[in-house]
Amino acid sequence: MPRIAALPDHLVNQIAAGEVVERPANALKEIVENSIDAGATAIDVELDGGGIRLIRVSDNGSGIHPDDIELALHRHATSKIKTLNDLEHVASMGFRGEGLASIASVSRLTLTSRQEDSSHATQVKAEDGKLSSPTAAAHPVGTTIEAAELFFNTPARRKFLKSENTEYAHCATMIERLALAHPHIAFSLKRDGKQVFKLPAQSLHERIAAIVGDDFQTASLEIDSGSGALRLYGAIAKPTFAKGKTDKQYCFVNHRFVRDKVMLHAVKQAYRDVLHNALTPAFVLFLDLPPEAVDVNVHPTKTEIRFRDSRQVHQLVFHTLNKALADTRADLTESVSNAGEVLHDITGVTPAPMPSENDSENLFNRASDYPTGNKPDTRNAFGSSGKTAPMPYQSAYAPQQRSLSLRESRAAMNTYAELYKKTDDIDLELSQFEQARFGNMPSETPAPKTDTPLSDGIPSQSELPPLGFAIAQLLGIYILAQAEDSLLLIDMHAAAERVNYEKMKRQRQENGRLQSQRLLIPITFAASHEECAALADYAETLAGFGLELSDMGGNTLAVRAVPTMLGKADVVSLARDVLGELAQVGSSQTIEEHENHILATMSCHGSVRAGRQLTLPEMNALLRDMENTPRSNQCNHGRPTWVKLTLKELDALFLRGQ
């Protein structure tokens, strides 16, 4: 067996380079982060051959002292930490002192730097790990680092590099992440001598638009929330902007781009109820917290981290995003502060609050939304205070949109209300509903003739609710509604599906425990030994989820009670899934996940179907419910429930004004 011997420093550096510098983008990241730590306000990046032939980074930072310039290229030489306590509280991008030494060992590196109080710059070169003597050079205040011929002395490593275009794409992505994390710094990027972009110092809002795109900015919701020493802010895309790729997902912790499972899981959970199929959300999230609350010294590239309290981080991310997405309904804006506080609404009227979890009011029994009398304490459709939205059927617009008399539409109203009566178990007094909502509307009287132009009878912007008023039904599928300077198309089945789904979920949350119903005849099934053991160990857990099972002996189990909401589910399959998971992990989310699936299915089958003819009062009642329902912009499967065509877009279809 060979004797043990210490490795030469140059080989050690090359081994370290294999961890830190996998490709040109990693070398670029290490150099640019040094510029950021130096307090630079402008960073210029030049790439040649995708960063393989040349990486040049120039900054206007504080520079390096002439006596330290050689030391800067040695391993574990840094000005950022001195003690273990410094490491635990590190706030700088770099701190190990490995980056430049690793790059110098696998490239031809030139370092030129000048401090403000120096009369000239100092330059040092490194090739194959060997340093030249420092020399005087001409250079403005700041630092320029050139790394040429990356991996020239490790041909095996160079063979693993991709094409120049691919390596450039990785470098450009890296610069975009760094620019996004530090909007106060101006960045420029050149590729093979051609300017790719030049970003001035900007606000975060402007930088997001410049990097992620104006389309994301238009379709995003701003968030800003805090919990103790933690602050989460940034922008998340509406569910309708979701893509099949993850290229527009950015997580920053203390302005460092990371790939963290805790944050990504929280984001996924928040979007779970509004995304369609395999689509992924787009987001730019910034989490600021004390440096000692996160360990960044986990991976050489520092993209993996560990939180001291991952549960707190998960809850902050989940609840902030969940609240923001829940407030994406027609009467709310896209700006959310402090985990969902609404700043203002699109009409200038105070928006309606989210329905209370204790609110057992029938979804159609909303006489207070559009009062027929002058009740000072009656809530209007936009909120509990502010301007009062007038009763739509008392305006001059009402006779023009009435297609059926109240007497003719009674049968349809009974049918539609019955759908909600089944989910609410609340007796809908239709006569009171009609009197409250349509008491002043003429029943059989034809629309009065008037010399006033049609446009004069349309309510002003302050009178129109966010989704406007229904004017017709199209092909038995869509509701056409007129809002301020726009035409809305609403998928009535998808909209009713979301309204029902959210109401049933709210009922579930109010109880805290799934209500169960006993089966008239218990259902038995043959169980495995593991399933029988799980029942013996977790009988109370099952009871809390509304499942009551008993062991009949001989590996036979009997289901005696199931959750009320899941009465029509496959009882045996549900019991097996829960028992199987309990046997493996000792806890279960199967019931909750299954319940959400069943709730979605129930709301789908319990909602108004395509082809069903609705009256205008029914259509308008659905629109008002959408305005007061969280996540009403999407159905339970993530599909949009409504779209808008502006007057400008309609004019363009007919070439008006061209």
Curated annotation (Swiss-Prot):
GO terms for molecular function: ATP binding; ATP hydrolysis activity; ATP-dependent DNA damage sensor activity; mismatched DNA binding. GO terms for biological process: mismatch repair. Transmembrane segments: none annotated. Pfam families: DNA_mis_repair (PF01119), HATPase_c_3 (PF13589), MutL_C (PF08676). One of its GO terms (cellular component) is mismatch repair complex. Keywords: DNA damage, DNA repair. The keyword Nuclease does not apply. Residues 114-130 have a biased composition (Basic and acidic residues). Residues 114-137, 369-401, 438-457 are annotated as: Disordered. Gene3D superfamilies: 3.30.230.10, Histidine kinase-like ATPase, C-terminal domain, MutL, C-terminal domain, dimerisation subdomain, MutL, C-terminal domain, regulatory subdomain. InterPro entries: DNA_mismatch_repair_CS, DNA_mismatch_repair_MutL, DNA_mismatch_S5_2-like, HATPase_C_sf, MutL/Mlh/PMS, MutL/Mlh/Pms-like, MutL_C, MutL_C_dimsub. This protein is involved in the repair of mismatches in DNA. It is required for dam-dependent methyl-directed DNA mismatch repair. May act as a 'molecular matchmaker', a protein that promotes the formation of a stable complex between two or more DNA-binding proteins in an ATP-dependent manner without itself being part of a final effector complex. Belongs to the DNA mismatch repair MutL/HexB family. This is DNA mismatch repair protein MutL. The gene is mutL.
